[in-house]
Design a protein with these regions (language model features):
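Conserved small-domain helix->loop->beta segment predominantly found in fold-type I
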Residues: 284-293, 298, 302, 307-309, ...
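N-terminal "arm"/small-domain region of PLP-dependent enzymes with the aminotransferase-like
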Residues: 6-68, 76
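Glycine-centered tight turns that cap/initiate beta-strands
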Residues: 83, 155, 326-329, 376, ...
Length: 440
């Protein structure tokens, strides 16, 4: 199914064509859509073939925890769309971010992260990783390049940020972060969930690793949970620290769990993702199910046209909200006058995605009343699908954060997150308008 030759053919095609055809090419009399391989095991007829699997000398499958042909096709498609050299799917976006850090960090290491990130990521970095002995230091992503570089320590192993902060909508200066990471001799890892490769491909601006919650725009229909890591193939894992020691021995030194195999020597520009699957997916079991891979793959086939409509609707809704007397403020990088408009135009010229944040005059109580009066728009703990949805992050996605931490993450107590769907633009605006009018 698919294969290397077909992937090379697809790289010469335009983005829209890659969305539709991706990594899969049906043979004669075979299904047009990717098949769902719902099997835990794979049969072999001699011990040698199985031994090759355990030594990572064969691309075939042996056990569903380590992947399946259906999941493989999604991984290849995500890598193709992001312009990467390899992809690796996980059970969720949280899992994708976690293993991207664990792949290169261990107890005693240090990570630098932009402060304006998804609440779940903030807790993962600030609480769970700290318990594992990995310190994540948060900082203002708008700091000058030299100030960011100055935060590095000898044990710093990664620089992390989100293309579009969730839900602050701060636009990450990708080239600045890439330059900072190069100066620190660490990989730049960026979560591209909100922008998607339809609007921004961070690897083109110097990112080394791209992560996704495919649960959002990639799937696009609210049907499947998943995550993905895409490797840029543009980082030298043999880099050494000031003392001449390897900074990333997990990739560039012998691995004790594979009889001394050196992942970077053997797999080159696919070393990061290969180790993710061979070690972390193997050990942690955060595997994507074949059905979720299938549904996400189906969603990706319409990614380009969906994002175009999300952007069109969002821009119209933003113009409506900015002029409504009951709206106190609005943050949408696609809106002229927004603080991050110029950065959005630079990195996302086709549009700043379909998510925005705004505040209703009257604060938190007024915001809650607004939500209760919506009829078409849904109150759900989700973004990035075909339905227009709203949420109050301070009491939901960022609820575990202290008030001080919420403010630091860009979460105003009255902030409303709005994910604009694919309904008729006028219908969306009419529903928002009638709910706002009832707050007066």
């Amino acid at each position: 199914m698919g294969g290397g030759l077909y992937m090379k053919e697809m790289k010469d095609m335009k983005f829209e064509t890659r969305c539709v055809h991706g990594a899969y090419k049906a043979e004669s009399a075979q299904p047009q859509n990717i098949p769902i391989i719902q099997s835990t095991t794979y049969r072999y007829y001699n011990a040698h073939d199985v031994a090759e699997l355990f030594d990572l000398d064969s691309p075939n499958h042996m056990y569903a925890r380590l992947g399946s042909p259906t999941v493989d096709l999604l991984e290849q498609k995500m890598a193709l769309l992001e312009g990467g050299t390899a992809g690796m799917a996980a059970s969720s976006g949280q899992a994708a971010n976690l293993i991207s850090i664990l792949n290169i960090c261990e107890q005693g290491d240090h990570v630098l992260s932009a402060a304006h990130v998804y609440g779940g990521t903030y807790n993962l970095w600030n609480v769970t990783l700290r318990r594992l002995g990995i310190e994540v230091e948060f900082f203002d992503q708008d700091l000058p390049l030299e100030d960011i570089v100055a935060l590095a320590r000898p044990n710093t192993k990664a620089l992390f940020g989100e293309t579009l902060g969730n839900p602050s909508l701060k636009v990450l200066d990708l080239e600045k972060f890439a330059a900072a990471a190069r100066a620190m001799k660490v990989p730049f890892i960026v979560d591209n969930t909100f922008a998607t490769p339809a609007l921004c491909r961070p690897i083109e601006f110097g990112a080394n690793i791209v992560t996704h919650s495919t649960t959002k725009f990639a799937d696009g229909h609210g049907t499947s949970i998943g995550g993905c890591v895409v490797e840029g193939g543009n980082f030298d894992w043999t880099v050494k620290d000031d003392n001449g020691n390897l900074k990333f021995p997990s990739l560039a030194a012998p691995d004790e769990s594979y009889h001394g195999l050196n992942f970077y020597e053997k797999f080159g520009d696919a070393a990061f993702c290969t180790r993710l699957k061979a070690v972390l997916i193997r050990d942690l079991g955060c595997t994507m199910a074949p059905m979720n891979a299938y549904l996400t793959h189906q969603g990706l086939q319409t990614l380009d046209v969906r994002m175009e409509r999300h952007v069109k609707n969002a821009e119209a809704v933003a113009e409506f909200l900015v002029n409504h007397p009951m709206v106190d403020w609005i943050i949408y990088p696609g809106l002229k006058g927004d603080k991050y408009y110029d950065l959005a135009q630079k990195y996302m010229p086709k549009g700043a995605s379909g998510v925005m944040s705004f505040g209703v005059k009257g604060g938190r109580e007024a915001g809650e009343k607004f939500l209760e009066n919506l009829e078409l728009c849904s109150i759900v703990v989700h973004v990035g699908d075909i339905h227009t949805s709203v949420l109050h992050p301070a009491s939901t996605t960022h609820r575990q954060l202290s008030e001080e931490a919420q403010i630091a993450a860009g979460i105003d107590p009255g902030l409303i997150r709005l994910s604009v769907g694919l309904e008729n633009t006028e219908d969306i605006i009419e529903d928002l308008g009638q709910a706002l009018d009832k707050v007066r």
